[in-house]
Design a protein with these regions (language model features):
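Inter-heme linker and motif-flanking segments adjacent to c-type heme-binding CXXCH motifs
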Residues: 1-171
């Protein structure tokens, strides 16, 4: 109530690279779309970079620990990455939870930022078209969404399709 402008307008007035990105984004994170930057950030200081309200992994790979994803779990249910079998995500092959498959590992789990751009992305479901740097290379990601699943093409790998109702077999 003491701000000189609406929160989102005020924040994006300085963070113009984020503003440019979300202006052309096909999908936007709900707090960004609603101009609620403080849902994730504390502009007056925070223990987590970059001014985050809670922990969020900074690296490409990380062992899965529930506390490391405290920022995400402030809004999203933990079951998105903890349950191997669930219907709570659209990213599943049958009932096999593909978020859990990629993230929930004791050593080299991929972090959310590998596939998702937290402010906005040029593909559906906040999926980025280039993963953050993996060494000197940014990995291209191409997501093709269907009504019941989709196909993901990552880097040099063959396409992987998934379907919630008619699971794709990879045996």
């Amino acid at each position: 109530k003491m701000l000189i402008e609406a929160q989102g307008t005020l924040c994006l007035g300085c963070h113009d690279t984020i503003q440019a990105k979300i202006a052309t984004a096909k999908s936007q994170h709900q707090p960004v779309r609603d101009g609620e930057c403080v849902a994730c950030h504390n502009p007056h200081g925070a223990a987590f970079k970059p001014l985050l309200n809670a922990a969020f992994p900074e690296s490409f790979y990380a062992p899965y620990k529930v506390g490391s994803y405290a920022l995400c779990f402030g809004c999203h249910p933990k079951g998105l990455v903890e349950f191997a079998r669930t219907s709570m995500t659209k990213f599943s092959n049958g009932d096999r939870n593909l978020h859990e498959l990629h993230i929930n590992k004791s050593e080299k789990g991929r972090t959310c930022r590998v596939c998702h751009s937290v402010h906005g992305a040029d593909q559906d479901r906040l999926v980025r078209s280039l993963s953050p740097s993996f060494g000197k290379w940014a990995i291209p990601i191409n997501l093709q969404v269907t009504e019941s699943g989709g196909t993901c093409i990552v880097g040099c790998h063959k396409p992987k399709s998934y379907d919630r109702y008619r699971p794709v077999s990879y045996q």
